[in-house]
UniProtKB/Swiss-Prot annotation:
Pfam families: Ferritin (PF00210). Oligomer of 24 subunits. There are two types of subunits: L (light) chain and H (heavy) chain. The functional molecule is roughly spherical and contains a central cavity into which the insoluble mineral iron core is deposited. Residues 6-155 form the Ferritin-like diiron domain. Fe cation 1 binds at E23, E58, H61. It is found in: Cytoplasm. This is Ferritin heavy chain. Belongs to the ferritin family. It catalyses: 4 Fe(2+) + O2 + 4 H(+) = 4 Fe(3+) + 2 H2O.
Length: 173
């Protein structure tokens, strides 16, 4: 038993392990998306870079959760990371819609985890989730929803190319 463990319920520990797996899955999916857009027959470098950064961000989230788990005296249980259901996307719009779906699922999972922390009176864990994850999720979902809207507006082909060039490569924040 860990000497630092205090007021850290096993249900919270299990939930963190599930969330770590979900964050790593999202990272893996975004990495697949990044590589798809790097292909010579797709050639959208803005999408490639956007999804590469998203992959790294999700990996960092997993590491943050691992460090928190260890800091609270919990143990990390490594699980298989599911492979992405697809590694090909018909368009940037399709990939952004999938990214939006994944971010919403991650947000739902984090909210459920916050509920577990609250149920077990773990105010430190609640504060950690709110400060490190939940606000960022809302911002990311908003940004992705805007990208989906604009990609629908500009259409495939030249419109998608211009979106890649002006929005993703153009430094829009």
């Amino acid at each position: 038993m860990s000497l630092v463990r205090q007021n850290f319920h096993e249900e919270c520990e299990r939930g963190i392990n599930r969330q770590i797996n979900m964050e790593l899955y999202a990272s893996y999916l975004y990495l697949a998306m990044s590589q798809h857009f790097d292909r010579d027959d797709v050639a959208l470098p803005g999408f490639r870079e956007f999804f590469a950064k998203a992959s790294e961000e999700e990996r960092e989230h997993a590491i943050k959760l691992m460090r928190y788990q260890c800091g609270r005296g919990g143990r990390i249980v490594y699980q298989d990371i599911a492979k992405p259901q697809t590694t090909e996307w018909a368009s940037g719009l399709e990939a952004m819609e999938m990214a939006l779906k994944i971010e919403r699922e991650v947000n739902e999972s984090l909210l459920a985890l916050r509920g577990v922390a609250n149920k077990n009176n773990d105010s430190q864990f609640c504060e950690f989730l709110e400060g490190e994850f939940l606000g960022e999720q809302v911002s990311d979902i908003k940004k992705l929803a805007g990208y989906v809207t604009n990609l629908k507006r500009c259409g495939p082909g030249l419109g998608e190319y211009i979106f890649d060039k002006e929005t993703l490569q153009g430094g829009e924040k």
